[in-house]
Regions:
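Helix-to-loop junctions at the C-terminal end of transmembrane segments
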Residues: 91-104, 318-332
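Helix-breaking motifs and short loop linkers at transmembrane-helix boundaries and internal kinks
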Residues: 54, 70-71, 95, 103-104, ...
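Glycine-rich segments within core transmembrane alpha-helices of 12-TM secondary carriers
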Residues: 164-197, 204-211, 396-410
Length: 473
């Protein structure tokens, strides 16, 4: 279906034009998009923050006493418990995004949240490290579809140069809330002995209960795709669909087939986005799982290590939002990913090689700022350079799946025998940042070349099959 045919299929959609003065149209646009923002970003950010809390509280629980209780110090048990989560998390990313439209985003994502909340609650009652490992695997099953599903939904609502700010706010609000996981873990661990339950168990029980509560609420509040929404008026819905159609021509979902999925997976740039995402999530997961343990190894006590784990997340929010705003304003992605990658490298070098603990701690601030900012930047970079609902679904799922690979690497390269400095893990993380810079350069050169050939009329077909489309650098 051509872009013109798609527009004609909306009926009154094409009749919605700004008035002669334009003031009513501007007011209508602002009111509509403000409503979209308020109905999407806060609820998904809040729910995903608890997904992150439930995913990363393993390190805090171990610091609070779970390690000796479940004998996690024996061999590689802690790494096994950590890494098992990512196996179903990776495998189920693409299938989850392929069926999300079939079941409806709101119902499907609320079901996932209920599942992982129940598992998290159950983790508070495990008695052996084997049961803990089983719960971690189930956690990966239920969380697999949530993040790529939300990225898919957000990118369906906004134009290409609006999406990074929204992705940044969604992800960073979640990250900031989850950044208090160590403080919350410390507070919950103070319940040690209440009802004959260990302090580390209370961490899982309370956080799992809150997740279940939010999952019930989310069934009524989670957003769906634009054409299925219930909070906008018909004219507002048509307006949103129209602006997406004019921006990239994919407001109408294309039919999904096995042949089409395999065709999309043959695009090497989708795999490049995934590997780039893996590179920037590796340090994020390393900090999430090991920051309190690393700080304790630097000589701080349990309480201080847990409390000092939160401050590095504050400047990360400000930095990433600034780069997201600048990126959308200048309609440029790759250069800002490079800058934030260099910030990560600087922080890694300080943390790995400085002899002073305060400098190493300062390096964690820079590392967290760089990696946290790269995550929404890469998601926006990939979302801007695909056209079509089916390809957008595959791209977001594949990208986030590679984030799980970053989690596996982080879980295995930070080994018990390398405590307290974890130098081999830091070296691997540093190498991943250089790989990120290389792939950003490679995709930028490729997109520059394809844009030039398209402008010169030397291509047999329009880029991404969409006339007038050009890749975002």
């Amino acid at each position: 279906m051509s872009s013109l045919e798609k527009k004609e299929s909306f009926g009154s959609l094409v009749q919605l034009e700004p008035d002669s003065v334009g003031e009513k149209f501007i007011h209508f646009e602002r009111r509509t998009m403000r409503s979209v923002d308020l109905h999407i970003i806060p609820i998904v950010a809040l729910l995903y923050s608890f997904a992150l809390l439930d995913r990363i509280n393993l390190g805090a629980a171990r610091t609070a006493g779970m390690g000796p209780a479940l004998h996690l110090e024996v061999g590689a048990r802690f790494s096994i418990c950590t890494v098992i989560y990512f196996i179903p998390y990776i495998i189920l990313q693409i299938p989850g995004n392929l069926i999300i439209r079939k079941f409806g985003a709101r119902r499907y994502l609320a079901f996932c949240a209920t599942g992982w909340g129940a598992v998290q609650l159950g983790m508070g009652f495990v008695t052996t490290w084997g049961y803990l490992t089983l719960c971690r695997m189930l956690l990966g099953v239920f969380e697999a579809s949530f993040f790529p599903g939300i990225v898919y939904i957000i990118s369906s609502w906004y134009t290409r140069y609006e999406v990074q700010k929204r992705l940044a706010f969604f992800y960073l609000l979640s990250l900031t809330i989850s950044g208090f996981s160590s403080i919350l873990a410390y507070a919950f661990s103070l319940l040690d002995g209440k009802r004959n339950i260990a302090g580390w168990s209370w961490i899982f029980i309370i956080e799992g209960s809150v997740t279940l509560f939010l999952a019930v609420i989310s069934f009524f509040l989670l957003p769906d795709f634009p054409e299925l929404n219930t909070f906008l008026t018909p004219d507002q819905t048509q307006f949103v669909l129209r602006r997406v159609e004019e921006d990239r021509g994919d407001s109408v979902p294309d039919q999904l087939t096995v042949r089409k999925v395999l065709h999309h997976l043959g695009d090497w740039t989708l795999w490049a986005y995934g590997i780039m995402f893996m590179c920037c999530t590796l340090p994020a997961y390393a900090l999430a799982y090991f920051i309190s343990i690393i700080l304790k190894g630097l000589g701080w006590g349990t309480t201080t290590a847990l409390l000092l784990s939160t401050p590095p997340y504050a400047p990360a929010f400000a930095s990433a939002v600034f780069f997201a705003w600048l990126s959308d304003k200048t309609r440029h992605r790759a250069g800002y990913i490079l800058i934030q990658g260099l910030i990560s490298i600087t922080g890694l070098c300080l943390t790995a090689f400085s002899p002073q603990n305060n400098v190493r701690y300062a390096g964690i601030f820079l590392l967290n700022a760089g990696s946290s900012g790269c995550i929404p930047s890469i998601l926006a970079y990939s979302a801007n350079n695909v056209v079509g609902s089916s390809k957008r679904s595959i791209s977001s799922a594949l990208t986030v799946a590679f984030g799980g690979v970053g989690g596996i690497i982080a879980s295995t390269v930070y080994r018990e025998q390398d405590f307290p400095r974890y130098l081999p893990g830091l070296w691997v993380t540093l190498g991943a940042q250089f790989l990120l810079l290389f792939l950003v350069g490679a995709t930028s050169l490729h997109f520059t070349r394809m844009n030039r050939l398209s402008r010169e009329g030397k291509l047999a077909a329009p880029l991404e099959g969409q006339p007038g489309f050009f890749y975002t650098l």
